[in-house]
Each structure stands twice: as structure tokens, then as C-alpha cells.
From Swiss-Prot:
Compositional bias ranges of the Acidic residues kind: 134-150
Protein name per the record: Transcription factor BTF3 homolog 4
Annotated segments matching region Disordered: 124-158
PROSITE patterns in UniProt: NAC_AB
Length: 158
């Protein structure tokens, strides 16, 4: 960059005369508790009501993962059509949640579950497939076929 342009930019940032220091950029540090307080105050404006007795909340994403809340705090404002779920969230694959989550799945999730079920046996078979060395050993145990049984059955039918 040109020295003249650089000097102009430096002069714009300077506070006071030539001998004073440049101003420092103020950095605002936000904590999680401050965000929570701001969120709770916004929810109070919406007049949310606590909903008791909810043991778990599962949010199923398009990619097949589930956001799982165990014993969450659920608040709702029906007039604003807003629900707030707070608590410890865990991202889990849908296969880990399967036995208990089937009743919660919708039509879209069931079709994606079918696709996942089709892929699952292939993965299991690929992992359990015998190695080429094992195949050679197994071939020794099976006797060779001496005659063709299909031709013999055709001859009997005639």
C-alpha cells in the first residue's frame, strides 16, 4: 500500500493529537448465562407456560440423526405458536434410538428408515464376508458335483 494512504488511514483512527495512542476496539464477551437470561426474558414477553411431565423430546433431522433431550424443560405459547425446549441435548444416530422411537416417526421418517434398513444388511454382510483365504479353505470341504441333476429330472419327466 502507498505510504500516503496508510498515513491518512492512521490519522482517521487516532484520538487526540499526534502523541496519543490509537483507540482500542472494544470486544464484547458474551457468556452462555447471559444468552440464557436474554432468551428467558424474551420468552416472558411471549407469555409462555411451563408444560410438566415431559420425559423426553426427540427431534428427527433429515440426515437421519436425532436430537435427544432427556427430562427437558418445555415451555409453550400457543398464541405465538412457539415452543421452547431447554436442557441437555445429545445428537444420536436414529439406529441407536430405534426400538423406542418407532411410534414417534412420521411418514417421511419411515421412508428414510426403510432406506436405512436396506443399507444395514449390506453393511453387515460386507463386514461378515469371508476373506479370500477363508473361501479356499471352505471349498475343500464341499464335494465336487459329479452329474447334472437338472438333465436327469428332465429325462424322468419324458
Amino acid at each position: 500500500m502507498n505510504q500516503e494512504k496508510l498515513a491518512k488511514l492512521q490519522a482517521q483512527v487516532r484520538i487526540g493529537g499526534k502523541g496519543t495512542a490509537r483507540r482500542k476496539k472494544k470486544v464484547v464477551h458474551r457468556t452462555a448465562t447471559a444468552d440464557d437470561k436474554k432468551l428467558q426474558s424474551s420468552l416472558k414477553k411471549l407469555a409462555v407456560n411451563n408444560i410438566a411431565g415431559i420425559e423426553e423430546v426427540n427431534m428427527i433431522k433429515d440426515d437421519g440423526t436425532v436430537i435427544h433431550f432427556n427430562n427437558p424443560k418445555v415451555q409453550a405459547s400457543l398464541s405465538a405458536n412457539t415452543f421452547a425446549i431447554t436442557g441437555h441435548a445429545e445428537a444420536k444416530p436414529i439406529t441407536e434410538m430405534l426400538p423406542g422411537i418407532l411410534s414417534q416417526l412420521g411418514a417421511d421418517s419411515l421412508t428414510s428408515l426403510r432406506k436405512l434398513a436396506e443399507q444395514f444388511p449390506r453393511q453387515v454382510l460386507d463386514s461378515k464376508a469371508p476373506k479370500s483365504e477363508d473361501i479356499d479353505e471352505e471349498d475343500d470341504d464341499v464335494p465336487d458335483l459329479a452329474e447334472n441333476f437338472d438333465e436327469a429330472s428332465k429325462n424322468e419327466a419324458n
